[in-house]
Design a protein with these regions (language model features):
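Short amphipathic recognition helices of helix-turn-helix/homeodomain-type DNA-binding modules
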Residues: 1-91, 386-393
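Conserved binding/catalytic microenvironments
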Residues: 94-400
């Protein structure tokens, strides 16, 4: 299936003439410029165009944690001028189709790494900064699937499915439901073609984030039906955490007991070796799930311990989408116990993190906090409520 060619470059502006030195020798103002280029808040200028396809490929090849600053340093080296010597992706594709087996293997590995990279970049960047590049990536996969030797078809179908699940998620974040549904169909076809039904588990898990209550729980339970009897432990841990979270939202006290199962699965898991989408799962994210469950159950003692663990796992300069969710949960807990000033502080932090990445997911998570603020008469709380509502309207998000 051809999905439509997207522009290769996202654009931005040049750095000021007198950069401020940073601790690693990279001008701090250059990093700021690149961040604004990638996120898309500056006007076009060819000198700071960022090749998102190549950025995703490089990030996908990294093994281990990548913080926001590392991502920006890589992007700083991939402006249009710096990436000019790299072959156009369509030229690489033509060579792959007509070249040797080694050429073909290299191209398949490049596409697999790039899919992983897009999943990793999603933690840090707004959906709008990635969507066109990801659809262009899917175009390459589509073309290669039509022409590649049979021995590569299953691998290409797997990575196409992994990419399509992310494209569906980004389309949902960008309020494009028809495109999101189309990518769901692509991922379903890829799961069937590759004989990797686990791809469907990811699709249904992503759907659960857009739902509430019983429908959200049912989406997670549908996802679990695609798990194998053994293995895929990172995905298993993620789905079990989501199930506990939604059970807690429904007031089911068994949710706290259910947290033991994902911990056991996580101990067996190898998130950086399993699936493109499992790279996000680490000890910090597991702590964030525990916090979310205990907040929903109103367990003040457990919230304190889980909150401290989640906060200690945070990289102060990274994963702002995760930050938005953690801060929102802590804010909700503080508002529940009547600590309004601390609650307001964390709501403000959550809102700032969600705005920074234009995260619909983060704003969705702030829905319960919005309801708690609505019952407050404190002037600061009322002002913050107004900011939340205006931000949600500006980004087109509905409250949870």
């Amino acid at each position: 299936m051809l999905l439509g060619l997207a522009p290769r470059f996202l654009t931005g502006v040049t750095a000021p003439p007198a950069p401020i030195p940073a601790r690693d020798g990279t001008p701090a103002s250059s990093l700021l410029s690149v961040e604004q280029v990638v996120i898309g808040s500056r006007q076009p200028n060819d000198a700071c165009d960022v090749d998102v396809l190549t950025l995703a490929w490089i990030v996908g090849r990294l093994d281990g944690h990548m913080d926001r600053r590392t991502m920006l340093l890589i992007a700083a080296g991939l402006t249009a001028e710096g990436a000019a010597s790299l072959a156009n992706p369509w030229e690489r594709l033509t060579l792959a189709l007509s070249g040797t087996r080694a050429d073909q293997e290299d191209t398949v590995e490049r596409l697999e790494a790039r899919t992983i990279g897009f999943h990793r970049l999603e933690y840090e960047l707004p959906a709008g900064a990635l969507y066109q590049g990801l659809t262009s990536h899917l175009n390459e996969l589509s073309a290669l699937l039509h022409s590649a030797p049979e021995r590569f078809r299953k691998r290409l179908a797997v990575t196409a499915g992994e990419a399509a699940t992310l494209a569906s998620w980004l389309a949902w974040d960008l309020k494009r439901p028809a495109q999101s549904a189309a990518f769901d169909r692509v991922s379903a076809l890829a799961a069937k073609e590759s004989e990797h039904p686990i791809i469907q588990a990811c699709t249904h898990a992503y759907h659960s984030y857009a739902l509430e209550g019983r429908p959200a729980l049912e989406a997670v339970q549908r996802a679990q039906q695609f798990l194998p009897a053994q293995g895929e432990d990172a995905t298993r841990a993620w789905l079990l955490c989501l199930e506990a979270e939604h059970l807690a939202s429904l007031g089911d006290r068994q949710a706290a007991e259910r947290l033991r199962q994902p911990e056991e699965a996580f101990d067996r898991a190898r998130p950086h070796r399993e699936r493109a989408w499992t790279r996000f799962l680490d000890a910090g994210r597991m702590a964030a799930f525990q916090l979310s469950v205990h907040v929903r159950l109103g367990d003040e003692r457990q919230v304190t311990a889980a909150g401290q663990q989640a906060l200690s796992s945070i990289d102060g300069d990274g994963d702002h989408k995760r930050l938005a969710v953690i801060y929102a949960d802590i804010a909700q807990a503080q508002l529940q116990i009547g600590d309004i000033p601390t609650g307001i502080t964390y709501v403000r932090r959550a809102l700032d993190a969600a705005q920074r990445t234009e995260s619909t997911w983060g704003l969705h998570h702030l829905g319960n906090v919005e309801k708690a603020l609505a019952s407050q008469r404190d002037p600061a709380a009322r002002e913050l409520l107004g900011d939340l509502i205006s931000t949600r309207r500006a980004l087109g998000s509905s409250p949870a």
